[in-house]
Swiss-Prot record:
<comment type="function">
    <text>Thiol-disulfide oxidoreductase which is required in disulfide reduction during c-type cytochrome synthesis. May accept reducing equivalents from CcdA, leading to breakage of disulfide bonds in apocytochrome c; following this reduction heme can be covalently attached.</text>
</comment>
<dbReference type="GO" id="GO:0005886">
    <property type="term" value="C:plasma membrane"/>
</dbReference>
<keyword id="KW-0735">Signal-anchor</keyword>
<dbReference type="GO" id="GO:0015036">
    <property type="term" value="F:disulfide oxidoreductase activity"/>
</dbReference>
<dbReference type="GO" id="GO:0016209">
    <property type="term" value="F:antioxidant activity"/>
</dbReference>
<keyword id="KW-0472">Membrane</keyword>
<keyword id="KW-0676">Redox-active center</keyword>
<keyword id="KW-0560">Oxidoreductase</keyword>
<keyword id="KW-1015">Disulfide bond</keyword>
<keyword id="KW-1133">Transmembrane helix</keyword>
<dbReference type="InterPro" id="IPR013766">
    <property type="entry name" value="Thioredoxin_domain"/>
</dbReference>
<protein>
    <recommendedName>
        <fullName>Thiol-disulfide oxidoreductase ResA</fullName>
    </recommendedName>
</protein>
<dbReference type="GO" id="GO:0017004">
    <property type="term" value="P:cytochrome complex assembly"/>
</dbReference>
<dbReference type="InterPro" id="IPR023555">
    <property type="entry name" value="Thiol-dS_OxRdtase_ResA"/>
</dbReference>
<dbReference type="Pfam" id="PF00578">
    <property type="entry name" value="AhpC-TSA"/>
</dbReference>
<feature type="domain" description="Thioredoxin">
    <location>
        <begin position="35"/>
        <end position="173"/>
    </location>
</feature>
<dbReference type="InterPro" id="IPR000866">
    <property type="entry name" value="AhpC/TSA"/>
</dbReference>
Length: 173
């Protein structure tokens, strides 16, 4: 009985130590890698859930709202319907919304997209390479990229519909 309790405590301690260590590691390196406002957004190539290739450099001339999210993320879930509602209006004005999932299974992401009827391009960041390049920490995190391919702003956290629309206006060409 005492051995089981001791083993349980050691396991919990190891898990907590690992979580704290990971958090400190992420915080330390995220500051070094953080995307710089006013600089060119790093190019990336992904394939969306429809099988269409998306390359950031091909979107020059358009504003890009780049959103990093996860199906398990409640704030992400709350803001997705706003993005979906505003997408057609701003697509006509030259703004593209791209949602990059944080390396979950295809089935989980497809189910989420179908559940919410998302119309904008959604892709999965396999291996979290793009997340690493952009220095993303907590989800949701979004980047505003102007028509010249420069990062205008980084937004961390959930957005209201009004905030989101303000950001989309900001990058409308």
């Amino acid at each position: 009985m005492k051995k089981n309790r001791l083993l349980f405590r050691v396991i919990i301690l190891l898990i907590l130590s690992g979580a704290v260590g990971f958090t400190l590691y992420q915080g330390f390196f995220a500051d070094k890698e953080k995307m710089q406002i006013g600089k060119e957004a790093p190019n990336f190539v992904v394939t969306d859930l429809e099988g269409k290739k998306i390359e950031l450099k091909d979107l020059k001339g358009k504003g890009v709202f780049l959103n990093f999210w996860g199906t398990w993320c409640k704030p992400c879930e709350k803001e997705m319907p706003y993005m979906n509602e505003l997408y057609p209006k701003y697509k006509e004005k030259g703004v593209e919304i791209i949602a990059l999932d944080a390396d979950e299974t295809d089935i989980a992401v497809k189910n989420f997209v179908n559940q919410y009827g998302l119309k904008f391009p959604v892709a999965i960041d396999k291996g979290q390479k793009i997340i690493g390049t952009y220095g993303v920490g907590p989800l949701p995190t979004s980047f505003l990229i102007d028509k010249d391919g420069k990062v205008v702003e980084q937004i961390i956290g959930e957005q209201t519909k009004e905030q989101l629309e303000g950001y989309l206006k900001k990058i409308t060409p």
